[in-house]
Amino acid sequence: MERFITWLARLQLAIGTLALVIFVAATLLQVLARYLNISVLWTEEVAVNAFIWAIFSGAAVMVREKKHFSFNALAMKLTGRTRLALVLFEQSVMLVFCVLCAFYSVEITDTFWHSKWVTLPSLQQGYVWLVLPVSFATSSLYLLEGMLKEIRVCVKREKPAWS
């Protein structure tokens, strides 16, 4: 299972990186077009939507790396069951948030699925909104993985991987 989750995180990071490249390319094209006094209408919308994909894809991977939201300063000072309780509480709160967001973002994605892009009406907005349930679902998976790792560390009395 860990191999699959690692593969999934790498895929998500690759998608986020590609989206960031598209964002930069669209932004540079927009700047160049303005400099040359040429009207390229679609670059702004492509840049914004690519940026959304880059941010949400990267945020999910950062949840797995424990670099997105954490109270590490306090957790690093605690040991044993006290540290485990704090870390599990923190990750449980995040998990509830991510599961709720995943659930409701499916509804949002469904609602806006057939909306069209303003400058590229052949494209559907649903593909942009799809990043929400994907990133929140994978964040939930990464949080569950992290919680299981923390429990294993405490049970085996090993040193945490992040310290």
Enumerate the language-model features and the residues they cover:
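Alpha-helical transmembrane segments and membrane-interface helix-loop junctions
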Residues: 1-163
